Amino acid sequence: MIPSAYPDAKEMARLTARMLLEIHAVHFNAKDPFTLSSGLPSPTYIDCRKLISFPRIRATLMDFLTVTVMRDVGFEAFDNIAGGETAGIPFAALVAERMALPMTYVRKKPKGYGRNARIEGAMGEGERVLLVEDLTTDGGSKLSFVDAIRETGATCGHTAVIFYYDIFPETTKTLGDHGVALHSLCTWWDVLAEAKQQGVFDEATLSEVEKFLHNPRKWQEANKK
């Protein structure tokens, strides 16, 4: 069911950040940084997958994501909702239910042969597909999923995520050059603002996180092990 009334984008961002902090999906550690898949250090880490275990928060954020897409793109803009393996699958299913649309998912690697080898579920020629994921950092990982969708003969010009890093300036260009618009609920800046408001991390940690967000490349270079 799609809610008939909902907060504006700014309030949804604040509430999303608050909920992510409440379930401890957000981790800040400047003294012992996390290691990203790239091998580079980061004082921040977020685990959106935890959301599936919190029904009230999960439902609220899926309502937010659904109305965000409808507000930004339209109420009748899509024919199919696709999730990326694996983190995007539960969220795609929940959004598809709210939008009363078919749901599919995209494999990271093909299974079998043919142009639908990476698609599970029914996706037809010419269908307008929304790609749903948990988060995006620099946008690069989304392109493989988009390409797999387009190989079926469907179109994919939009991706919706719960969380967008918003610290790498090339992200929107990377997606835009590929013909993909990004829709998100909140960013690290929203989380930082809410963390400061709640006082859930000490000042030294928040200061170091803010330095990272303003210039992640410089921070990573200075904190390489």
From Swiss-Prot:
Cross-referenced Gene3D superfamilies: 3.40.50.2020
Signal peptide bounds: none
GO biological process, one term: 'de novo' UMP biosynthetic process
EC number: 2.4.2.10
Keyword entries, A-Z: Glycosyltransferase, Magnesium, Pyrimidine biosynthesis, Transferase
Highest taxon of source: Bacteria
Cofactor: Mg(2+)
Pathway terms, separated by semicolons: Pyrimidine metabolism; UMP biosynthesis via de novo pathway; UMP from orotate: step 1/2
Binding site residues for orotate: T137
Keyword Magnesium recorded: yes
Chemical reaction(s) catalysed: orotidine 5'-phosphate + diphosphate = orotate + 5-phospho-alpha-D-ribose 1-diphosphate
Pfam families per record: Pribosyltran
Molecular function GO labels: magnesium ion binding; orotate phosphoribosyltransferase activity
Annotated 5-phospho-alpha-D-ribose 1-diphosphate binding sites: R107, K108, K111, E133, D134, L135, T136, T137, D138, G139, G140, S141
InterPro entries in UniProt: OPRT, Or_phspho_trans_dom, PRibTrfase_dom, PRTase-like
Job of this protein: Catalyzes the transfer of a ribosyl phosphate group from 5-phosphoribose 1-diphosphate to orotate, leading to the formation of orotidine monophosphate (OMP).
Family to which the UniProt record says this protein belongs: Belongs to the purine/pyrimidine phosphoribosyltransferase family. PyrE subfamily.
Assembly description: Homodimer.
PANTHER family: OROTATE PHOSPHORIBOSYLTRANSFERASE, URIDINE 5'-MONOPHOSPHATE SYNTHASE
The protein's name in its UniProt record: Orotate phosphoribosyltransferase
Species assigned in the record: Roseobacter denitrificans (strain ATCC 33942 / OCh 114) (Erythrobacter sp. (strain OCh 114))
Gene that this polypeptide is encoded by: pyrE
